[in-house]
């Protein structure tokens, strides 16, 4: 689904089961977008749409707390850790700031604090967040944000950045200090790097942020050393007891500067809200002239004691706020409108534009979302239009400029047949979504389904990337997922740019994927609207593929995260003979699906019937894994502590939930004691 499709659904009239499914689907969608943005640095929706959807999810859950998803973006920051680097646990969680989008909202933040306060103001750099750990004043290691709990150890790459101190400039360094900042590439360096990349590698980065993030994730630090990356520090994380913390945020930044760190030369200390407005006005007008990209401004309460008093939410500090700039808009011309086909057959119109520079990037394509949007905005081929781009996303056409319309401008109509396979296109429930009915017979759907099948959270065939999938489909070497497991060395080496070593790596990766968990397999086969959370719930409920295949609608709607819409999709999937044939072919070629491990004792006297809250991070358990384990032995896992809570299971970096449990006298169980009870 697209953001507009989420907004178009009349959720206020949905039945409870449908509303729960809608909330779960929205939470899954936001988790995926968070992963694309924070981990892969490849967002596909704008920051503005993400923020609107996040607020929608917040509002829905506030009104329907019984439907709050477990481990959703409401509790997390960012996405999951990318494989390939050693994973390091943050000593102090890397949180993110709440966002505001207008001066009115910024004023509300200011007015909520019942004090006459100073705010430390600074630009919001658009780069890669990093945490650098120093031991006795010497560089120890560097870690990316990751999911906020743990990140990727990228020490060798970060050490190549010229302005990163390898030793703190002080004669009396603290025993331990964690400095946080943003790694960026300035605009001029970005243009120079892209010129080099285009000449030598025939590819370019979309923007400076992607260039910085991509550089830090390279395995060859010698290549990274040649790139003019820069670190701007904005604060500290963990620190040892011997560190003398300054009294104000502004003094902290000056201290970091004295240690040898670069801080923004556009920092400002506002003594009242009038000065905040002046700073906002100044930076908004100077933004385009800065040497580096910024996507907003950050405002922090200056007094450190007041920061401590105000405290934190699960997502981040309550004493700071990020103001996000509006997306950039420019004028262009629609040269043509083409229709693309997605994994589920959804038809998406895309405008081919007269190339135009937006935010330092040349844009020639923009999404039109759906045919209803085209008609609502009255966009025609040949029109002059306003194009908006925010971050590394597909730009969108905001509106047409009919006052400049030529007499030969063409009205855009939805095709009746698929532009790829010529199958009939059908409207879905009179909504904005039109779908190709070709299914596996449509090459576009086949390609996207296969990309989904091999993806990291599905079968995890990591060496079989999107471009190679496209090559294999175009060469008629694969059509259905099982065909992947029939590929041989000769077929792969016969493809363009596939050497012997690369081909063998692909085959090894395919072999490694032959024993997926049931949850992964359910997710991989691509049943419409089934995400990770739903796949886990289905796998844990049914326990085997055979039981899942025999699932009845009445049973499905009783499962957590499965509403009537998803239940219907599952039943329809298993009624399709081609789907059954595809799954049976998997089993015939030796795919061994691993069923969920059943707990020896279905119930545990320590947890059966108990209401349990989990807080903090754990060395031996993932949060989702622990939640599922506790549910499987009869516990009721909830997200908030109250008088009805029987126990709180507490990991590292526990926050307000632990404090509230202690205030209410609720039993607290530490990880060291948890194994014995389980």
From Swiss-Prot:
PROSITE patterns: BRCT (PS50172), DNA_LIGASE_N2 (PS01056). InterPro entries: BRCT_dom, BRCT_dom_sf, DisA/LigA_HHH, DNA_ligase, DNA_ligase_CS, DNAligase_adenylation, DNAligase_N, Hlx-hairpin-Hlx_DNA-bd_motif. Gene3D superfamilies: 5' to 3' exonuclease, C-terminal subdomain, 6.20.10.30, BRCT domain, DNA ligase/mRNA capping enzyme, Helix hairpin bin, Nucleic acid-binding proteins. One of its GO terms (molecular function) is DNA ligase (NAD+) activity. NAD(+) binds at residues 47-51, 96-97, 122, 145, 182, 300, 324. Its EC number is 6.5.1.2. It is an enzyme of class 6 (ligase). DNA ligase that catalyzes the formation of phosphodiester linkages between 5'-phosphoryl and 3'-hydroxyl groups in double-stranded DNA using NAD as a coenzyme and as the energy source for the reaction. It is essential for DNA replication and repair of damaged DNA. This is DNA ligase. The lineage of its organism: Bacteria, Pseudomonadati, Pseudomonadota, Gammaproteobacteria, Thiotrichales. The gene is ligA.
